[in-house]
Amino acid sequence: MSFLYVCNTSSDNISKINLASFKEEIKIPLGMDKINKIGPHDLCVYNDMLLSANIYSSSLSFISLNEDKETENYFIGMHCNGVKVWQDNAYVICGETNSLFLFSLTKKKIIEEIPCGIFPHCISICEKNNLAVVANMHSESITLIDLSSKECIKNIKVQSYPTKAIFSEDGRYILVCESKMGLNKRGTLNIIDLKTLESLKRIEAGSCPVDIFLDGKYCFVSNFADGTLSIIDVNNRKEEKRIKIGGMPRGIVKSGKYIYAGDNYNNVLVQVDLIKESKKVITIGGEPTGMTLC
């Protein structure tokens, strides 16, 4: 059975969605003291645990996938935006410290800090090349990091307000979501060659693209400001289709013939059937943001 877990940032919980029935099974509450705001923002899976990077409590939560409850929580650094796991370490980016923190999942402590650009917003890892890439919103750059040496390889200048950067499945390219937030321009997907670190092509998406999900040759983009989803053919380097779903789509994933997008404005999860081009909607928590399949 497949599940989708969604961060509900303003309601301090995580929705567990049964994809077969497209129903919310449970909201998993975060905040072990039940007093302070948590703000879950990004998720990743580690063994039988779900890790949540929390922007308000500046912490990393451990959620048991078997028990559907938070079991541990550790302070990391101010404004934890994103988290990924590589070799028993959690790589957590903190927007207000402009840093990437390595948190040992065996020792349960921070073991290293790597500087990034200004206000890092997301992190992605390429296991094929032992690399990580961080999108820095306010310095309009991405930081490429060697995971083996734990050193910055290069800060690469990109266009305005990059919200996400990921690696292509073959490890040859970096795909950067350049949102151009607040500039009254359409955002772009920037394809960067990993060998030369030069831009090969910028493909226009919708207004203020904020998240991307890669499946084969297709990149699915959530356009926050115009309520649309872009489907981009990475190989042919063009936008093939744009689907109107309304609201303010934030996090996006694809499973089978469906795209799932969290509507940050209406507090709903939208399921789009790519074949029928129809949609279904269910209510979840407040301000859905990061999501992951499991």
Regions found by a protein language model. Name each.
Residues 1-294:
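Predominantly soluble domains enriched in secretory-pathway, periplasmic, or organellar proteins
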